[in-house]
Structure formats: structure tokens, C-alpha cells
Amino acid sequence: MEEKSFAKELDQWIEQLNECRQLSESQVRSLCEKAKEILTKESNVQEVRCPVTVCGDVHGQFHDLMELFRIGGKSPDTNYLFMGDYVDRGYYSVETVTLLVALKVRYPERITILRGNHESRQITQVYGFYDECLRKYGNANVWKYFTDLFDYLPLTALVDGQIFCLHGGLSPSIDTLDHIRALDRLQEVPHEGPMCDLLWSDPDDRGGWGISPRGAGYTFGQDISETFNHANGLTLVSRAHQLVMEGYNWCHDRNVVTIFSAPNYCYRCGNQAAIMELDDTLKYSFLQFDPAPRRGEPHVTRRTPDYFL
């Protein structure tokens, strides 16, 4: 019976969050506890079945996430796979990440949420989520509940054994998916090493491995992605992590696709956003969308930190 009444309570929370109204601190705490129980059973390479709709960075742009669900279909009617970066930069990180975690707890088989490089204690203290939690709750407890939960998020997902999804990119320390399965992910994102690379690396026009201008992860060339896909029986690496003006961008002779789902990123970049629908035969189509009509911005005094595009 307890499960049933919790589901009912969750439905009320989801309804409230859909109106961009935050939960109480104690509600967030119990939501995060429940989410840990679910995520702890998921793999570093979480298996996902098609049909599924794959999404890139959202970055606290709550009204644009609503637009994404309007275009792609509501959860749980549509299965979703989000590739990280739910928080920072946008004005509504709290409501955005709370809603996605609530949907995960309510419909664990219908939505997959991966870890991005912003799902980290260190990064969120610089790029907005920490300050937003302080402003909206008056203390850092909610920030702590979420950043503790972030350690449990799966690092990657595999759609029908063929399409490999993750936030950033490949790693010189990783040749096979089994290498990823063997990592201990229950920790803050390290400054270097395989787990860091999966969340920070970027594809590049130059071959081989390169030093990343981001100061973490690597750049990797087409030779690397072709070899990785071939060795692991993959048809595609799907990733996010980089702003692309059309919302999606193919590279490496279609071995890699970048998907970015925050339109007019940082409320000023003028980009479209996109999501990738995979049907039950793994045929893909991209849906592009523009920002939701702007409501008045919240009154925030903030220094906008420099950021990598």
C-alpha cells in the first residue's frame, strides 16, 4: 500500500513541478533517497530498449524542457534518455532537475538520466546551481541532496546494443564497454581518468587523441570513434556537451552525433535545440525546436561566469 500512496504523492509533486513550483526541502530529501534506491541498481552502461527519444543538455532552462516534452511527447507516453547537464547556467536548475528525478522515480523503466560534467559538486558551485539552491531554500541542503544523488547516475547507456549514449566522449583508457562496466562510479567526477573523460571529451577534426581546451578530458578523431564503434559492435556514438547551432550535428562520417537540447543557450546564443527519436527499428529522426515564449526573468543578481561553448 505504501508504494501506491507514494506514487500518488509523486504524481502531486510532478503536477506541482510542471507548473515550475519547487518542492519543499523535506520532499526533495525523500525524493533523492528513493532515486538512489533505483539508480544504485543501474549499470555504468545502462541497457535501454527502443523506441526512445534521446536528449542533450538542458541546463536549467525549465520552460524549454516543457517545450521539449510538448514536441517529443509527455513522460511516460514517450520513453526518454537524457545525456546529462540538467543544472547550471539556466535560471531554473532546481525545478528542472527535481522534475527529471521525480519522473525517474515515478517511471523508472520509461526514463533514463545519465550524468553530465555539470552533475558535480565542484562545477555546480561555480556555474549557478549552488547559488540557486541557496537563494530558493535559504541553505545548501537541497544542493547537497542532489549532488550526493549525482554520484549514483549511470555514466552511459546502450540502446538495443547498437547506439552508445553518453555526455562527453571517448577515453584513451577505455577500449570496450566492459572497461566502463568495471568503473566505480559512486564518487565525485574525478579531475582525470576514464570517468572524467566520458563526461568531458569532445570529437575533433584532427585524428588521434588531443589535449582538450576545456582542461579536462581529451579530443578524439574519426579514427578513434571508428575503431571504438567497430570493436564494440556499435553503429553510433550519441553525445551532448557541445553547443551546436542546429541542435544536432553529425561528425566523424556519421560515427558520432552531438545533440544539444537547450535552445537559445544561456538565453543569448540564438541556437535551435534538438532531440533524436529512435523508433522500434532504431531508425532516427531529429526534432528541432526553438525556445518557449519568454516569461519575465526572475530578478537575480549574478555574475555570469565565463563558459566554454
Swiss-Prot record:
Activity regulation info: Inhibited by the interaction between PPP2R2A and ARPP19; this inhibition is enhanced when ARPP19 is phosphorylated. Inhibited by the interaction between PPP2R2A and PABIR1/FAM122A.
Keyword Ribosomal protein: no
Entry's localization field: Cytoplasm; Nucleus; Chromosome; Chromosome, Centromere
Source organism superkingdom: Eukaryota
EC number of the protein: 3.1.3.16
Enzyme class: hydrolase
GO cellular component, one term: cytosol
Binding site residues for Mn(2+) 2: D85, N117, H167, H241
Residues with the Phosphotyrosine modification: Y307
SUPFAM superfamilies per UniProt: Metallo-dependent phosphatases
Residues reported in the UniProt entry to bind Fe(3+): D85, N117, H167, H241
UniProt cofactor note: Binds 2 metal ions per subunit. Can be two manganese ions, or one iron ion and one zinc ion.
Annotated residues for binding of Mn(2+) 1: D57, H59, D85
Catalytic activity: O-phospho-L-seryl-[protein] + H2O = L-seryl-[protein] + phosphate; O-phospho-L-threonyl-[protein] + H2O = L-threonyl-[protein] + phosphate
Protein name per UniProt: Serine/threonine-protein phosphatase 2A catalytic subunit alpha isoform
Natural source organism: Gallus gallus (Chicken)
Recorded name of the encoding gene: PPP2CA
